[in-house]
């Protein structure tokens, strides 16, 4: 910041006043307001433009790609200026918010015609990434959360607010869970005490450009928090919310509330309470697991293909946002899960005969009631918001008709009907509310209130009169002219209007003797006189001001309408929640029918049994998908706790593991699952250690990241956790990696006792099954022909025979000479391993294999002789009498696929 900039924003009154004296009155006004918001861009209203000055102008010009100009001077330097049109401000604001900027809106509130000096201006609202409510600034299908954090000793207090939905939540956890909570909540903006410095926050600010604001520490005072929050909720205390023991998170909530009030410049009356989240409410997932499962974002940061992109066919934006929330917050309460599953079952009906499609069709015409309700509370709802709300409320009874009979016992059971019926009952619109909206609004109101045409005819007598004057001006003049001709007997009398003289009656000089006494001369012309009468004068005053007065009257009536609608905030929020939930349940039903999903079953036994499971996302990306079983937990002969998974690269190990986790996640969300059947015991957490990545900003290598993730799992996994471990130890030397992988596997078996899928290329780990009864080996099959590999993607019992790494390298396009050299080195290593001889120096120039690398062009490597056809190789391994019908069919598909690739 330049010295002149520091002086303009100085907190020293003497310095600041000295700076002001060098500026015009208007610029003094600007600087006084700007000094209150030094760290934000300020849109300063001047006529039809929002202007920015000094450093704000330079910054905005770069960010928005707008012209940087000058206006006057300051301390001998030109004042930089940039501006955007008032009517197009939203598109510029949206861009700034996406870049993480906050913007102060300073409006003209005085009348330029009556102002002496600069027009009075004041800040009407502050737009920040976490406090958005305008439809033009928000993503339709994504929530925008404001998060406040406070730390006391090892306790992390969180409070977050979705202002556009009126949802306010708090929770407390260990400070070690900061990264996991940031990944779960995905806040648009974070508030911290000035004294708090969190490493996890700093890392993410650098990596993801998070918007972080530091507030005075006193705003997080826990002693004052209860009073502040109780005053907002209109309660004596907070005992009704179950948060008496959450002092740290309440301090964060109080600071968040104050910040939100400041930004809105209006009451936030739709924030009527808070919800307490406990750590055991949801199936927990750390940040790594959420990323690896690609729930709503791919590893590369794309929105598709993900689990959310596959499932989100919701009819409403409210439903889409709730679906995303459900996928990131799988429930642990079996009763709540069963309620959702019952609802889905009912909406599907027998053989797809349920009402889900008709419900979805009705909901497609329902607007975003949730966000409109917030804008009503904040007095920022626009006319089309209200007309959309009116039309949506009128359509909701059709949903009831679509699910007629849900209040009685259906084929799915009485509980099914009761759950859906409860949602239908909760979304029934208040008749008085609908009547008010119908009576007050035009059928198709104008987009903006400033243009008028919003309030319905017949709603207000004064407005009707003003409109009649404005709209029927010509008709009145013709009627007056006819009456005056009859009264005076002057046939050529005219009643007319012009901008300079207003309304007048024109009479030629030949008829001046017939002029009545109530005519008053307004203008003399060469051949005529122009007059005005008391009646015409009164009409003129009304007509000339009718349009502006009508607009002011509409604004007044619209404000009163918003006040009346505020009485229905609780009702509208309940309607919105019910519509969103019914939408998600109907979407689950539609997806289950379209994608052939089945109803998951839950048990109190420690077991995960899935028959013919599929990866929900991958199966839609390929022509055919091989379904596979998984069995973990209690079984005859003991508890099958760990599967050691071997097989070739690209053989499907990671897909197999992920599909197990995704099936478990979907079941806990209340969705049907991509499997023939699924039986799931109690789960508390999902963990994944999959893939390779580094953290350059944090100074952590790929192997360090891998070990950090493994350490987190070993410290936190329980006997009710599902753990996916993929190729642990590959980031270091062979022996180090193998030793670590073996030790980690044993720790998971003996200490954590978690359900574990352990994929590896260390075939030595398959010996765990010999040492531990709770370990089983499975592998994904592949066959080779002429050094080409065919992946069968079928999971079979027992360990794999080899990894097929060279064949996969060839598929990746590694040059043939490299593959041939690698094959010879591999042969030597295998021979040495079999002969139990010390490993030779593969890279010595005296080595036989180094010399063979220089074979004459066109010569044939004897090791390249072709083995038998892969289909024949596979057929030789099949024992028909040992195959079930299902396994035989899978083998047949594998043979066909192998044959087609030849």
Swiss-Prot record:
<dbReference type="GO" id="GO:0006298">
    <property type="term" value="P:mismatch repair"/>
</dbReference>
<dbReference type="Pfam" id="PF05192">
    <property type="entry name" value="MutS_III"/>
</dbReference>
<dbReference type="InterPro" id="IPR036678">
    <property type="entry name" value="MutS_con_dom_sf"/>
</dbReference>
<dbReference type="GO" id="GO:0003684">
    <property type="term" value="F:damaged DNA binding"/>
</dbReference>
<dbReference type="Pfam" id="PF01624">
    <property type="entry name" value="MutS_I"/>
</dbReference>
<dbReference type="GO" id="GO:0005524">
    <property type="term" value="F:ATP binding"/>
</dbReference>
<dbReference type="InterPro" id="IPR036187">
    <property type="entry name" value="DNA_mismatch_repair_MutS_sf"/>
</dbReference>
<dbReference type="InterPro" id="IPR045076">
    <property type="entry name" value="MutS"/>
</dbReference>
<dbReference type="GO" id="GO:0140664">
    <property type="term" value="F:ATP-dependent DNA damage sensor activity"/>
</dbReference>
<dbReference type="InterPro" id="IPR000432">
    <property type="entry name" value="DNA_mismatch_repair_MutS_C"/>
</dbReference>
<dbReference type="Pfam" id="PF00488">
    <property type="entry name" value="MutS_V"/>
</dbReference>
<keyword id="KW-0238">DNA-binding</keyword>
<dbReference type="InterPro" id="IPR007696">
    <property type="entry name" value="DNA_mismatch_repair_MutS_core"/>
</dbReference>
<dbReference type="GO" id="GO:0030983">
    <property type="term" value="F:mismatched DNA binding"/>
</dbReference>
<comment type="similarity">
    <text>Belongs to the DNA mismatch repair MutS family.</text>
</comment>
<dbReference type="InterPro" id="IPR007695">
    <property type="entry name" value="DNA_mismatch_repair_MutS-lik_N"/>
</dbReference>
<comment type="function">
    <text>This protein is involved in the repair of mismatches in DNA. It is possible that it carries out the mismatch recognition step. This protein has a weak ATPase activity.</text>
</comment>
<protein>
    <recommendedName>
        <fullName>DNA mismatch repair protein MutS</fullName>
    </recommendedName>
</protein>
<feature type="binding site">
    <location>
        <begin position="647"/>
        <end position="654"/>
    </location>
    <ligand>
        <name>ATP</name>
    </ligand>
</feature>
<dbReference type="Pfam" id="PF05190">
    <property type="entry name" value="MutS_IV"/>
</dbReference>
<dbReference type="Pfam" id="PF05188">
    <property type="entry name" value="MutS_II"/>
</dbReference>
<keyword id="KW-0227">DNA damage</keyword>
<keyword id="KW-0547">Nucleotide-binding</keyword>
<dbReference type="InterPro" id="IPR007860">
    <property type="entry name" value="DNA_mmatch_repair_MutS_con_dom"/>
</dbReference>
<dbReference type="GO" id="GO:0005829">
    <property type="term" value="C:cytosol"/>
</dbReference>
<dbReference type="InterPro" id="IPR017261">
    <property type="entry name" value="DNA_mismatch_repair_MutS/MSH"/>
</dbReference>
<keyword id="KW-0067">ATP-binding</keyword>
<dbReference type="InterPro" id="IPR007861">
    <property type="entry name" value="DNA_mismatch_repair_MutS_clamp"/>
</dbReference>
<keyword id="KW-0234">DNA repair</keyword>
<dbReference type="InterPro" id="IPR005748">
    <property type="entry name" value="DNA_mismatch_repair_MutS"/>
</dbReference>
<dbReference type="InterPro" id="IPR016151">
    <property type="entry name" value="DNA_mismatch_repair_MutS_N"/>
</dbReference>
<dbReference type="InterPro" id="IPR027417">
    <property type="entry name" value="P-loop_NTPase"/>
</dbReference>
């Amino acid at each position: 910041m330049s010295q002149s900039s520091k002086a303009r924003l100085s907190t020293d009154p003497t310095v600041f006043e000295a700076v002001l004296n060098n500026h015009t009155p208007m610029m003094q006004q600007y600087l006084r307001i700007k000094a209150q918001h030094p760290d934000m861009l300020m849109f300063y209203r001047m006529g039809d433009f929002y202007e920015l000055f000094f450093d704000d102008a330079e910054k905005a010009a770069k960010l928005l790609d707008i012209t940087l100009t000058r206006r006057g001077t300051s301390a001998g330097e030109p004042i930089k200026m940039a501006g955007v049109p008032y009517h197009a401000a939203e598109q510029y604001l949206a861009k700034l918010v996406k870049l993480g900027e906050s913007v102060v809106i300073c409006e003209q509130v005085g009348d330029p015609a009556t102002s002496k000096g600069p027009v009075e201006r004041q800040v009407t609202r502050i737009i920040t990434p976490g406090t958005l409510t305008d439809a033009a600034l928000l993503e339709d299908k994504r929530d925008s959360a404001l998060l406040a954090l406070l730390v006391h000793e090892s306790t992390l207090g969180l409070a977050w607010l979705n202002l556009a939905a009126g949802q306010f939540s708090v929770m407390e956890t260990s400070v070690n869970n900061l990264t996991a909570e940031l990944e779960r909540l995905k806040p648009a903006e974070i508030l911290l005490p000035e004294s708090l410095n969190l490493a996890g926050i700093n890392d993410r600010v650098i990596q993801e450009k998070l918007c972080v604001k530091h507030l005075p520490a006193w705003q997080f005072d826990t002693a004052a928090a209860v009073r502040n929050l109780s005053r907002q909720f209109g309660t004596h205390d907070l005992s009704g919310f179950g948060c008496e023991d959450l002092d740290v998170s309440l301090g964060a909530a109080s600071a968040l509330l104050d910040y939100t009030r400041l930004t809105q410049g209006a009451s936030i009356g739709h924030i009527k309470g808070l919800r307490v989240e406990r750590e055991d409410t949801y199936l927990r997932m750390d940040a790594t697991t959420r990323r690896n499962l690609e729930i709503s974002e791919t590893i590369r940061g794309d929105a598709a293909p993900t689990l959310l992109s596959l499932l989100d066919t919701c009819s409403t934006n409210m439903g889409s946002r709730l679906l995303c929330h459900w996928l990131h917050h799988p429930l642990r309460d079996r009763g709540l899960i069963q309620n959702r599953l019952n609802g889905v079952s009912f909406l599907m009906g027998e053989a797809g005969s349920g009402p889900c499609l008709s419900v979805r069709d009705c909901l497609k015409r329902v607007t975003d009631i949730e966000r409109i309700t917030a804008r009503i509370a904040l007095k920022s709802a626009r006319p089309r918001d209200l007309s959309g709300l009116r039309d949506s409320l009128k359509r909701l009874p059709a949903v009831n008709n679509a699910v007629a009979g849900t209040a009685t016992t259906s084929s799915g059971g009485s509980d099914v009907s009761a759950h859906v019926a409860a949602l239908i009952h909760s979304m029934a619109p208040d008749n008085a509310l609908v009547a008010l909206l119908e009576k007050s609004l035009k059928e198709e109101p104008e987009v903006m209130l400033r243009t008028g045409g919003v309030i319905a005819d017949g709603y207000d007598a004064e407005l009707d009169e003003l409109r009649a004057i404005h709209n029927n001006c010509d008709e009145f003049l013709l009627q007056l002219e006819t009456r005056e001709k009859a009264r005076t007997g002057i046939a050529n009398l005219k009643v007319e209007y012009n901008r300079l003289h207003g309304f007048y009656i024109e009479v030629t000089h030949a008829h001046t003797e017939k002029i009545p006494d109530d005519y008053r001369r307004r203008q003399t012309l060469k051949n005529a006189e122009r007059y005005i009468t008391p009646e015409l004068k009164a009409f003129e005053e009304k007509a000339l001001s009718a349009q502006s007065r009508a607009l002011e009257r509409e604004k007044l009536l619209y404000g009163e309408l918003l006040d009346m609608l505020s009485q229905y905030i609780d009702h509208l929020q309940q309607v919105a929640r019910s519509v969103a939930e019914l939408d998600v349940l109907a979407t689950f039903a539609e997806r289950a029918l379209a994608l052939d999903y089945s109803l998951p079953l839950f048990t109190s036994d420690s077991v995960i049994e899935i028959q013919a499971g599929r990866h929900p996302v991958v199966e839609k990306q390929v022509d055919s998908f091989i379904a596979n079983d998984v069995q973990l937990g209690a079984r005859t002969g003991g508890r099958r706790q760990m599967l050691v998974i071997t097989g070739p690269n690209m053989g499907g190990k990671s897909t197999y593991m992920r599909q197990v986790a995704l099936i478990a996640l979907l079941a806990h969300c209340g969705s049907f699952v991509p499997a023939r059947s699924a039986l799931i015991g109690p789960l508390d957490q999902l963990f994944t250690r999959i893939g390779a990545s580094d953290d350059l900003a944090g100074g952590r290598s790929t192997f360090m990241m891998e070990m950090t993730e493994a350490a987190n799992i070993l410290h936190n996994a329980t006997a009710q956790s599902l753990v996916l471990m993929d190729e642990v130890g590959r980031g270091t030397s062979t022996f180090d990696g193998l030793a670590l992988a073996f030790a980690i596997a044993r720790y998971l078996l003996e200490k954590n006792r978690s359900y574990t899928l352990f994929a590896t290329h260390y075939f030595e780990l398959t010996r765990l099954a010999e040492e531990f009864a709770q370990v089983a080996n499975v592998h994904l099959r592949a066959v080779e022909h002429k050094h080409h590999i065919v992946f069968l993607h079928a999971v079979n019992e027992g360990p794999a025979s080899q990894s097929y790494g060279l064949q996969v390298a060839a598929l990746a396009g590694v040059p043939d000479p490299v593959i041939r050299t690698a094959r010879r080195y591999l042969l030597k290593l295998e021979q040495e391993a079999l002969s139990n001889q010390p490993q030779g120096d593969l890279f010595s120039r005296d080595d036989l294999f180094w010399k063979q690398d220089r074979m004459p062009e066109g010569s044939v490597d004897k090791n390249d002789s072709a083995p038998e056809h892969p289909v024949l190789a596979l057929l030789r391994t099949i024992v028909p009498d040992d195959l079930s019908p299902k396994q035989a069919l899978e083998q047949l598909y594998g043979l066909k696929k192998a044959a087609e690739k030849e």
